[in-house]
Each structure stands twice: as structure tokens, then as C-alpha cells.
Amino acid sequence: ATVASLPILEKAIASPLPEMRFWGVVGYAKLARENQINICPQTLLALLQDENPYIASEAAYTVVYLGKAQEGIARLITPVQEKDRKIGYSSLECLSLDPEMRDYIRPFLSELKEAAENLPRLENEDAGLMARGILVNLGEMDIKDLHCPEAYKKGLKLNYGRRAMVPLPNSFE
């Protein structure tokens, strides 16, 4: 996407087709992230309430870069449906890796800490793990606390239970 493609992106984000809206938002995200645009159109802001959680999440990510950090991050932290929490957290994790965006996330630390503590810890790729990952990225949690002791023990049990490699790597016997 380029600035010259903005009229096409505007049509795309207003489309009744979810695929068009999604890719239109992705185009806006690229331009916003690269500081090629700095105005947030109302149509894009309205997509924070899109029924498709992927579109809403990408729109939220985008509006943060367009000066609407409060609205965007609030949408990523608070899903419409609990089952979609990981979608928003995925975008929030990307934002937390950008040093320029970290201060915008900090007002939401209490929500993230609560999610990190209360959401399931042992499920693979669970939202609690994602919340803890965001806190690690922000420097609010030690990387050693990313996984709980039960998960660590479970991992050790799995590794100790594996069949030994024969022959060993780099051995000549």
C-alpha cells in the first residue's frame, strides 16, 4: 500500500465484504506504521466494532498508530466475546514489541496483570500466556515467570520421558 492507494483503501474498508475490509485495514496499518499517514478516518474507527474479530483487531492496531491509542488498546484488551481474546492479544503483543507504543499500553497494566494471573496457565497458546508475554515485553514481568511451575514440571517430565537418541549427534561410533 502507498499513499496513492488511499482512495482504494477507503473503498475497501467500507466494503460489505469482510475480506475487502480486512485487507483495506492491513493497507492502512502499513501506512500508519511507516508514518506515511497520520489521520484516522471515521470509517476505520468504526471498524473497531466490526463483527469480525480479525478486522476489529487489525483496525484497533492501526488506530493506535493514528493517534487513537486509548480506543485501539481498549478494544484489544476487551474482546466482544471471550473466545476472541487471543486475537486482540496477538495484535497487542505486536504493539508491545514497538518501544514507541509501550507507554500507550501501560495505562492498561492492571487489566493485563489480572488476565495474566486469572486466565488458564496450562493450555497451549492460552490468553493468560499471551498476557504474560506482553507484560514481559513491557518489562513488567520477569521472563522466568512466563510459565508457571506446573508447566515447567510438565515439560521436564516430557523431556525426560523421551527415548534417548542413538547414535548421539556428532558421535562417530
Feature roles, as predicted:
Residues 143-157, 161-173:
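Eukaryotic protein-protein interaction scaffolds centered on beta-propeller repeats
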